[in-house]
């Protein structure tokens, strides 16, 4: 993988993480589970560690979070509320311990850790002045939080005054606000009784409760607080270990989790981690891992901090959760290219904070591999805590009335024959645009952001238009009028006019976007761009032979035949001509002559994760340099730019003796020629 590919991947990861940080920290409306965020963050961090020259000050790894919502007064934390680095395996935890051992001047034997469950709630800071609760704030972005003092005062297990005759002049207590399962269930039951919206999970309920502008509402929510550390402390001599500080907090009335333990050495820590995994279902509140801290405060100070996390602590996260449920039925869906996908209809089950009732079975081979039948008890896993998967079947529980899953021979939507081409795992409907399901998906693809980018025409509008037989081909979209659109559900005059304006704007596009929008099988964005740059106009592309098509970078025999066959079908030609007749146009494709450089006229393959520029930016740069960015390695390949976790392409390049360079090496060469 090239340095440019790595850079592009880093950029994409940063953009994705920033979006989810905004949803999580600013709106308190997370769109993905923590485990998926952790996976993305871990991937970005690993790439930046391997390529430190690509680290930028605004990377999510270099700060804690996002800015707080308006509506509450902002409070700047005197000491930043840092997050923790994560471990996802014993090996990563042991590597953390090794880093500590390497850094300490005098290594105690054994290393003692204060081990805690990682509560799945909201981090808060609570200030006591002369023993009286005076201020509380959310963590926010770690530097600035929101003033939630009035709401924190309503939480019953937080003392308004410390239980001591000799309180500190100032004391900052940090911890987690969460909602136990029992209270969460009662809250949702009451919401259902009153016809109100329920919360998806206890963390969302806690977040929504803490951020109520009316403290009376918060006071009716079953929130609980557990302390996990001391921040500012003035006018008091604190104990010399983290565990003893927690015990001191308990002694002055601050609640601390009852599962906190001292563990001597790595093996004991890992035993604690596994014991918390076993206890997790019966705790009565959500945890998503363990927090493991060097106990000695002096050692903590010696180890210090990196920009966003302490070196002396780590969160060892649990793997994705698995649950058992029953397969009630299997439905078969039809995709844009006619692919038939079996979808498992499950008895609803709560997995990792989300109710799961559907899961893909991928294809007929997967059904055979699992030996799955309707009525079976199946194991559901949310991969990365996001995508529901059936990972196993409890065949010993198969009921007597279990039914075999019969893959259809006719399309469930249009009745056309279903065929499976030799060498492909996917079976497909042969109905083409005669099939409403394929028509809908093809039209959704046509208007999508990366294709024609018609943002005023969404999936629901496409569904209505096809169902009411108002459109059959992409060109029909441009024949719609205001009156027709206003007759549709949820389409007032303003929405209808917005749709028409978007359609008019989309008429001015690029040849690459237009080719991609046509939905030719296996022609993605990169291939569409290569085709546009190579042939310069649609007539030349339409007239190209399979051999001429294979001269284009990233176009092999299979893809060339797909493109060639597409242009041999009269209905496709008619559809394209109709679009042109509706005013679709683009500027003539002009390729600037690249200056002399080592990549001009060469075929380059990208592999692995590019962190400095990202894959798409790297491909664009290669085209500017006069190179061809291909998708597979062959004897015709001149260079392979290898990023992190490069796989089979790198192996094949080494076998063929193709020159391999890193992303950093590639960029260094490019920069040298730019000078």
UniProtKB/Swiss-Prot annotation:
Origin superkingdom: Bacteria
What cofactor(s) does the depicted protein rely on? Mg(2+); Mn(2+)
* Short name of one Pfam family: HHH_5
Which ranges of the sequence are coiled-coil? none
The positions annotated for binding NAD(+) are 34-38, 83-84, 116, 139, 176, 293, 317
Q: Carries keyword NAD?
A: yes
Q: Which GO terms describe its molecular function?
A: DNA binding; DNA ligase (NAD+) activity; metal ion binding
Alphabetized PROSITE patterns for the sequence = BRCT, DNA_LIGASE_N1, DNA_LIGASE_N2
A cellular-component GO term for this protein: cytosol
The record's section on SMART domains has:
BRCT (SM00292), HhH1 (SM00278), LIGANc (SM00532)
What positions constitute the catalytic site? Answer: 118
Q: What does this protein do?
A: DNA ligase that catalyzes the formation of phosphodiester linkages between 5'-phosphoryl and 3'-hydroxyl groups in double-stranded DNA using NAD as a coenzyme and as the energy source for the reaction. It is essential for DNA replication and repair of damaged DNA.
Matching entries from HAMAP family are given as:
DNA_ligase_A
**Protein name per Swiss-Prot or TrEMBL:** DNA ligase
């Amino acid at each position: 993988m090239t340095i440019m590919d790595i850079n592009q991947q880093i950029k994409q990861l940063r953009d994705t993480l920033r979006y989810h940080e905004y949803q999580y920290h600013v709106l308190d409306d997370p769109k993905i589970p923590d485990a998926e965020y952790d996976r993305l963050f871990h991937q970005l961090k690993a790439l930046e560690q391997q390529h430190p020259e690509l680290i930028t000050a605004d990377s999510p790894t270099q700060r804690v979070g996002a800015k707080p919502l308006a509506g509450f007064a902002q409070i700047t934390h005197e000491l930043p509320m840092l997050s923790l680095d994560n471990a996802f395996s014993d090996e990563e935890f042991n590597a953390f311990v090794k880093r500590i051992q390497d850094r300490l001047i005098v290594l105690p034997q054994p290393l003692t850790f204060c081990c805690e469950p990682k509560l799945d709630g909201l981090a808060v800071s609570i200030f006591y002045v002369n023993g009286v609760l005076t201020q509380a704030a959310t963590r926010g972005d770690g530097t600035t939080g929101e003033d939630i003092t009035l709401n924190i005062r309503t939480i019953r297990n937080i003392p308004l005054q410390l239980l001591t005759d000799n309180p500190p002049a100032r004391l900052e207590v940090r911890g987690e606000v969460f909602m136990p399962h029992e209270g969460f269930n009662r809250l949702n039951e009451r919401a259902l009784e009153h016809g109100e919206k329920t919360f998806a999970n206890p963390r969302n309920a806690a977040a929504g409760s803490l951020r109520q502008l009316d403290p009376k509402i918060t006071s009716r929510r079953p929130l609980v607080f557990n302390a996990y550390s001391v921040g500012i402390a003035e006018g008091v001599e604190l104990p010399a270990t983290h565990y003893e500080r927690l015990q001191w907090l308990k002694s002055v009335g601050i609640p601390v989790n009852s599962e906190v333990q001292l563990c001597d050495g790595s093996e004991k820590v890992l035993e604690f981690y596994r014991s918390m995994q076993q206890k997790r279902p019966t705790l009565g509140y959500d945890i998503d891992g363990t927090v493991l801290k060097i106990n000695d405060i002096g050692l903590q100070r010696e180890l210090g901090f990196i920009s966003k996390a302490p070196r002396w602590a780590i969160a060892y996260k649990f793997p994705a959760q698995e649950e058992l449920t029953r397969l009630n039925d299997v439905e078969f869906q039809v995709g844009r290219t006619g692919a038939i996908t079996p979808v498992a209809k499950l008895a609803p089950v709560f997995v990792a904070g989300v109710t799961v009732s559907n899961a893909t079975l991928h294809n007929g081979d997967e059904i055979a591999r699992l030996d799955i039948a309707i009525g079976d008890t199946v194991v559901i896993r949310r991969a990365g805590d996001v995508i529901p998967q059936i990972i196993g079947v409890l065949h010993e529980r198969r009921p007597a009335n279990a039914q075999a899953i019969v893959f259809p021979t006719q399309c469930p939507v249009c009745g056309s024959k279903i065929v499976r081409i030799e060498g492909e795992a996917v079976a497909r409907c042969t109905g083409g645009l005669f099939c409403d399901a394929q028509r809908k998906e093809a039209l959704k693809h046509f208007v999508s952001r990366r294709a024609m980018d018609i943002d005023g025409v969404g999936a629901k509008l496409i569904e209505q238009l096809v169902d009411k037989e108002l459109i059959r081909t992409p060109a029909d979209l441009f024949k719609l009028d205001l009156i027709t659109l206003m007759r549709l559900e949820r389409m007032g005059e303003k929405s209808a006019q917005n749709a028409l304006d978007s359609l008019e704007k989309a008429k001015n596009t690029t040849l690459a976007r237009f080719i991609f929008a046509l939905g030719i099988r296996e022609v993605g964005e990169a291939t569409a761009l290569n085709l546009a740059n190579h042939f310069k106009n649609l007539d030349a592309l339409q007239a190209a032979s399979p051999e001429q098509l294979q001269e284009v970078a990233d176009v092999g025999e299979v893809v060339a035949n797909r493109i060639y066959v597409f242009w041999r079908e009269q209905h496709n030609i008619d559809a394209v001509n109709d679009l042109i007749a509706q005013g679709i146009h683009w500027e003539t494709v002009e390729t600037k002559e690249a200056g002399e450089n080592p990549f001009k006229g060469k075929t380059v393959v990208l592999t692995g994760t590019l962190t400095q520029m990202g894959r798409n930016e790297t491909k664009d740069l290669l085209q500017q340099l006069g190179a061809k960015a291909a998708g597979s390695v062959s004897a015709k390949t001149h260079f392979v730019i290898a990023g992190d976790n490069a796989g089979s392409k790198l192996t094949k390049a080494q076998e063929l003796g193709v020159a391999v360079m890193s992303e950093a090496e590639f960029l260094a060469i490019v920069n040298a020629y730019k000078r």
